[in-house]
Amino acid sequence: MSTQSTASVSTHILDTSIGRPADGVTISLAARTGADAQWVALGGSATDPDGRCKDLPALPEGTTHVRLDFETEQYFTKKQAEAQQDAPRVRDSGAFFPEVAITFAVVPGEHFHVPLLLNPFGYSVYRGS
């Protein structure tokens, strides 16, 4: 039995176009145990009214890489966010970023908080605390 504890992950989303949390964004979590290993889907959740996703599944022991998939198209469609922007768009072409996939490395025993700052035409992500 290993004495190493597993890493853990949390996230939240802020919609920088309105200065508010992004509520109701579906997030999927996948992990792998090495750079050449296959991704294993672990499950997912959705952001709450504070933009937080508090119940992502635990990471399996031996996880070295994590992928968070943020399904942003439905959020932007619901908010009609792109229609409120001045940027030229092809009518009915859908969200410019229909999804955002973030992949990062983890080490056992550490917590990784990975916030997403999002707007209809850009995003930024960082390791939080």
Name these PLM-found stretches.
Residues 26-30, 67-69:
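Beta-strand signatures of extracellular beta-sandwich domains
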Residues 17, 25, 43-46, 57:
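Short hydrophobic alpha-helix segments
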Residues 36-54:
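Short, acidic Ser/Thr/Gly-rich low-complexity loop/linker segments typical of extracellular
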Residues 1-23, 31, 123:
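Beta-strand-rich domain onsets/edges
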Residues 54-64:
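Short Pro-Gly-centered beta-turn/loop motif in secreted/extracellular proteins
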Residues 17-19, 28-30, 49, 53-54:
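Charged, well-structured alpha/beta interaction segments
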Residues 2, 65-129:
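Feature of secretome-associated and extracellular-like proteins
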